[in-house]
A protein has these predicted regions:
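Cytochrome P450 core scaffold surrounding the K-helix E-X-X-R motif
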Residues: 80-83, 297-310
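Short secondary-structure boundary/capping segments
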Residues: 212-219, 300, 309-312
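Enriched but not universal
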Residues: 1-29, 424-430
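Acidic glycine-/aspartate-rich tracts in secreted/extracellular proteins
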Residues: 75-78, 145-148, 298-300, 428-430
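Short, solvent-exposed loop/turn elements at domain surfaces
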Residues: 78-86, 148-153
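C-terminal, surface-exposed recognition/capping segments
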Residues: 203-206, 234-260, 272-275, 279, ...
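Charged, compositionally biased non-catalytic regions
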Residues: 18-67
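Short aromatic-cysteine micro-motif
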Residues: 55-58, 63-66, 91-288
Length: 430
């Protein structure tokens, strides 16, 4: 059965348009809106229930290697508007989301230049939806961290030992799959999925994290956001944020132990899966808080307080283990922060440029503790071959979360071999 037939068969309820409405069922993922032949080119097929917003498989697709991936439709955001529902509480960080297809400026594969993200009335296209200088109608992100699918392929599989970028003969390491047992194996094995794939970019992770923030702000109960907190003190995705497969803020969370040992958890093994997804629903991206330090491409920190982020002209698939920190792929700016473990606080609200627009959700506006962002860690550690890790940071517990951004995180460098290094792949449609 081809993708056209599957798309007609799966699900019976009408799906929300695109990214959906924050706080509501299905928000944060969606049905691929392009030509079904794009899915075929990517090796993807819709799962049963893919078009049904009530299904655990809503917006979920399966790759030929067994990977489960979530479709994240392109969206625009608006920050700090006085008419935003949460403005009285969240002020400058009150976040609104609209599907990008609602704006006449947006078109899949349309050429993009710096400044084109300004869609008017404060609405801004997220940087994650530009790849290789063109607008993209979505990205697909692995639902789970990558593990070995049994054929030495990195695949997103439920209840599995996520792959450690570790120089060890254990079955759950990239070394046993033919890699070097180093952080940069994450790049190699992610892009091996096909021409449209790469290691998840810092922009894609930012988009996913911002969706979680907007969903928490838009929710009024746990009906469609299982991790919702009406007191707004722990209103963010939970996960394996303690070093024993439990969550720092929610004692009801428990994971199965990774084969490495009880310090780590198997991906997709939570007893409360909705609570550990980015959108508080079973259809969402899992294990985005804690678990391990999850590698992303597209960021460098080569000198003090200077961060480089992926250029507009660069495609995510362009990154390899050999060019991973090349200056030709990154544009630098001064964050004003410098080395040390701090906190992530605030979303940058620019309409153009790397420092103020592209960095939104990647680099904070300040480094003070902020419960809106989970009191998550932000740390810089300048050296020539450093990369950005997400989710866990250097100390687990309160500072681990979906807004954790760490240039250190253990040994930190791409060439480092470390048991807390994991990853997931993402892809763009042709």
């Amino acid at each position: 059965m081809d993708n056209n037939a599957l798309l007609l068969l799966v699900g019976s309820r009408k799906a929300p348009k695109g990214i959906g409405k924050a706080g509501q069922q299905g928000f944060g993922v969606g049905v691929y809106g392009g030509d079904p032949s794009d899915l075929t080119a990517m090796g993807l097929a819709p799962m049963q229930g893919c078009k049904n917003p009530a299904s655990k498989n809503y917006g979920n697709y399966q790759h030929t290697n067994g990977s489960i991936m979530c479709c994240v439709p392109a969206f625009c955001y608006r920050l700090g508007n006085s008419n935003a529902p949460s403005y009285s509480r969240d002020g400058a960080n009150a976040l609104e989301i609209r599907d990008a297809s609602e704006f006449p400026q947006f078109k899949h594969n349309k050429s993009f230049s710096d400044g084109d993200a300004d869609f008017g009335d404060g609405w801004i296209l997220h940087r994650a939806f530009i790849d290789g200088g063109k607008m993209k109608n979505c990205f697909f992100m692995d639902k789970y961290l990558c593990s070995n699918n049994g054929s030495n392929q990195a695949a997103s599989i439920k209840n599995a030992d996520w792959l450690m970028c570790l120089d060890s003969s254990s079955s759950y390491t990239t070394k046993t799959m033919g890699g070097d047992g180093c952080g940069y194996d994450a790049i190699t094995f992610s892009r091996a999925r096909g021409d449209h794939y790469s290691l998840t970019t810092v922009y894609q992770w930012s988009a996913m994290a911002m969706l979680s923030l907007a969903h928490g702000q838009g929710a009024s109960s746990t009906s469609y956001c299982a991790w919702y907190d009406s007191a707004h003190t722990t209103n963010f995705p939970k996960g394996a944020t303690n070093s024993d497969g439990t969550d720092y803020n929610d004692s009801s969370i428990k994971y199965n132990a990774h084969s490495y040992g009880s310090d780590f958890a198997k991906t997709g093994s939570s007893n409360n899966a909705e609570k550990v997804s980015h959108n508080g629903q079973l259809c969402g991206i899992m294990d985005v808080a804690g678990m391990c330090n999850q590698w992303c491409i597209g960021a460098t920190n080569k000198s003090s307080a200077t961060v480089g982020l992926m250029k507009l002209s660069v495609s995510a698939h362009d990154f390899t283990k050999d060019n991973r920190v090349d200056d030709s792929l990154h544009e630098t700016f001064n964050t004003g922060f410098g080395d040390g473990n701090k906190n992530f606080s605030g979303l940058r609200n620019g309409k153009s440029g790397t420092a103020n627009w592209a960095s939104c959700g990647v680099i904070p506006t300040s480094t003070s503790a902020n419960s809106l962002f989970g009191n998550d860690e932000y740390s810089e550690y300048f050296t020539s071959d450093i990369g950005l890790k997400m989710g866990s940071g250097s100390g687990w517990e309160e500072n681990a979360g979906v807004f954790c951004r760490s240039f250190s995180g253990g040994v930190g460098t791409w060439y480092g071999s470390y048991y807390s290094f994991g990853f997931r792949a993402s892809g763009y449609a042709p």
